[in-house]
UniProtKB/Swiss-Prot annotation:
HAMAP family: Dala_Dala_lig
Entries under PANTHER family matching the protein: D-ALANINE--D-ALANINE LIGASE (PTHR23132), D-ALANINE--D-ALANINE LIGASE B (PTHR23132:SF23)
Named cofactor requirement(s): Mg(2+); Mn(2+)
Main location, first listed in the record: cytoplasm
Biological process per Gene Ontology, one example term: cell wall organization
One Gene Ontology MF term: D-alanine-D-alanine ligase activity
Cofactor note: Binds 2 magnesium or manganese ions per subunit.
Protein name: D-alanine--D-alanine ligase
SUPFAM superfamilies: Glutathione synthetase ATP-binding domain-like (SSF56059), PreATP-grasp domain (SSF52440)
Top-level division of the source organism's lineage: Bacteria
Annotated gene: ddl
Binding-site residues for Mg(2+) 1, renumbered to this chain: D262, E275
Amino acid sequence: MSGIDPKRFGKVAVLFGGESAEREVSLTSGRLVLQGLRDAGVDAHPFDPAERPLSALKDEGFVRAFNALHGGYGENGQIQGALDFYGIRYTGSGVLGSALGLDKFRTKLVWQQTGVPTPPFETVMRGDDLAARATDIVAKLGLPLFVKPASEGSSVAVLKVKTADALPAALEEAATHDKIVIVEKSIEGGGEYTACIAGDLDLPLIKIVPAGEFYDYHAKYVADDTQYLIPCGLPAQQEAELKRIARRAFDVLGCTDWGRADFMLDAAGNAYFLEVNTAPGMTDHSLPPKAARAVGISYSELVVKVLSLTLND
């Protein structure tokens, strides 16, 4: 697809594993990315920061990194800052975009100030009176609701709450994962979609139809009964406009090069953006490979395209 000489990349580290709650997903993503790059002739090597110090990257002559870490320090700006310090080019967003992209609370604040539509929400802090906050939130937002830790990915500890009685326990569970919990009004009627972003590639939207209540961790990485609709079924003009808004949602956070923007449609077709992902999963269940495959781009071609974005000034 790209016609890039793989020798231009030099010695490439595929970063995967790490120590976040998403370690197992990252291990799967990283192994596939590693194989995809090697299939294209790239001099790629595995590197798990949970097992080796990052300083080894410089010591061992790596000049480039494909970041397949998910969550935690791999996605919150820390790895990005360290790679900047060592002068190693890397895939995905820089420090600011990565940090904001993993923080759903501050993402939503930026979107509110820049005109990107996002569901109404409330925040709960660890240590708050959960019963009192639950009563207040239901009065403001109604039901159903989604409860989310502010800084976990892969839908870790995300719960859908349909009754007021269930909300305090959901808040307590989410607060074990993060000191800030987001409670978001559930957008109903139009379905869930994702826009995959990879440089200048024009990738189709994907409509996600999980067998269960919503697109949770199990539906993302375990179940085989989630439906991924490509084409997504929307009129071409609407799809193009939604992709434009998705790119804006990505850009205003300082995110660059590649990732995902997830959103819901209500019954009237209005979009509400949920989150971005600056280091998307690359497993066989993951969305970017599916979107690429739908337009004739193989897994290996996709990872080379993503890596090629590190060649840009």
